[in-house]
UniProtKB/Swiss-Prot annotation:
It holds the Pfam family WbqC. This is Uncharacterized protein Rv1507c. It comes from Mycobacterium tuberculosis (strain ATCC 25618 / H37Rv). GO terms for cellular component: plasma membrane. InterPro entries: WbqC.
Length: 231
């Protein structure tokens, strides 16, 4: 039995993204999809004293209407220091900020990032390592890509020797489960409900934030606030 998920990369995604990674045996980063503006690929939210704040990685999009996520280039370098300053300003009082900063700050302040997909993968690897998630991370371009929205997903699963395809519930609107049935691959819709609240800075609990909020606030206890991280 092998569970596979196929998802586009996100910038410092929320905790449910990592719970899905922990739930499956192989997580295929689906960055052969077209880059879309005002999405989660290059931005996320953090919690501040003034409420939720977007932090966005600037990317080159002018004249690049059909570029894939993995072809998307980062525009400039100033963003990295600005993002770290925002994280430091809003989370330096968090209980585990210093611990997380030890391995996270160098990614922002010492490394050079020119490609959005590679940046997202770098952060994904670092966060998974901290959480103890050992799921295999693969790239969609390491496989042959079929035509057709559902057919491509099913074919990726088949090449990965999957017996089960796990997807977020929003894909119900376009995934044709019959295509998977023909390949004897089960489709499971991942449930993102039921996450425990944790102590945050700045007032009442806000669930729709980057996982960095969880890490800064609870540190090594973060897997306790995911459902599949230690199973």
């Amino acid at each position: 039995m092998k569970k596979v998920a196929i998802v586009q990369s996100n910038y410092i995604p929320w905790r449910g993204y990592f719970d899905l990674i922990a739930f499956v045996d192989e997580f295929i980063i689906y960055d052969d999809m077209q880059y879309t503006k005002r999405d989660w690929r290059n931005r996320n939210r953090i919690k501040t004293s003034q409420g939720l704040q977007w932090i966005t990685v600037p990317v080159q999009v002018k004249g690049r209407f059909h570029q894939k996520i993995r072809e998307t280039l980062i525009d400039g370098t100033d963003w990295a220091k600005a993002h770290w300053r925002a994280l430091e300003f809003n989370y330096s009082a968090a209980a585990h900020f210093a611990e997380i900063a030890d391995w996270l700050a160098p990614i922002y302040l010492e490394e050079q990032h020119t490609n959005l997909s590679l940046l997202n993968r770098r952060l994904l690897n670092a966060i998974c390592s901290y959480l103890g998630i050992s799921t295999r991370l693969a790239n969609s371009w390491d496989y042959e890509l079929a035509d057709g929205k559902t057919e491509r997903l099913a074919n990726l699963c088949q090449q990965a020797a999957a017996t089960e395809y796990v997807s977020g519930p929003s894909a119900r609107s376009y995934v044709d489960e019959r295509v998977f049935d023909e390949l004897s691959i089960r489709v499971t819709w991942f449930d993102y409900d039921g996450y425990r609240d944790y102590k945050q800075l700045w007032g009442g609990f806000e669930p729709a934030v980057s996982i960095l909020d969880l890490l800064f606030n609870v540190g090594a206890e973060a897997p306790d606030y995911l459902r599949y991280c230690r199973q």
